[in-house]
């Protein structure tokens, strides 16, 4: 059985991208995202995760690509969406301790290989 999840790459009008830091797991910066519920479409899951993790409501989601990968030895399918967000993120303080925009050339060092792969997919879709 392949687990499915969503990743949302949100940029602001200045072209900066939104990253979040979790209160659990390996410390570092990630794109907002999470699992897809049993009766949920990937797009609905993306909207829900953005709202839960950043407080931002998104209207215009674009599917950038689908990555089939292995996470912790198990098959995983990730639906990667992009959107533009105008509002300042407000992390919930429980699951997400920090959410902020970064300029592309000033991204934090502490980003996982999975996060970087998603960034590359997005960058190749934009150019």
Give, region by region, the residue ranges found by the protein language model.
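Conserved N-terminal beta-strand and adjoining loop/helix that marks the start
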Residues: 1-17
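A generic structural signal for short beta-strands and their flanking turns/coil linkers
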Residues: 4, 25-27, 32, 59, ...
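Conserved Nudix-box catalytic region and its N-terminal flanking loop in Nudix hydrolases
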Residues: 12-52
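Unchanged
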Residues: 36-59, 65-123
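A periodicity- and composition-biased signal for non-globular, repetitive helical segments
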Residues: 27, 123-124
């Amino acid at each position: 059985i392949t687990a499915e999840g969503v990743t949302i790459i949100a940029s602001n009008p200045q072209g900066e991208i939104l990253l979040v830091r979790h209160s659990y797991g390996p410390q570092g910066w990630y794109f907002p995202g999470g699992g897809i519920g049993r009766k949920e479409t990937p797009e609905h899951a993306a909207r829900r995760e953005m709202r839960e993790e950043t407080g931002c409501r998104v209207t215009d989601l674009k599917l950038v690509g689908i990555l089939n990968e292995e996470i912790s030895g198990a098959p995983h399918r990730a639906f990667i969406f992009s959107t533009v967000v105008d509002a300042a993120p407000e992390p919930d303080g429980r699951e997400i301790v920090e959410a902020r925009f970064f300029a592309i050339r000033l991204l934090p060092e502490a980003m996982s290989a999975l996060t970087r792969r998603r960034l590359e997919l997005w960058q190749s879709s934009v150019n």
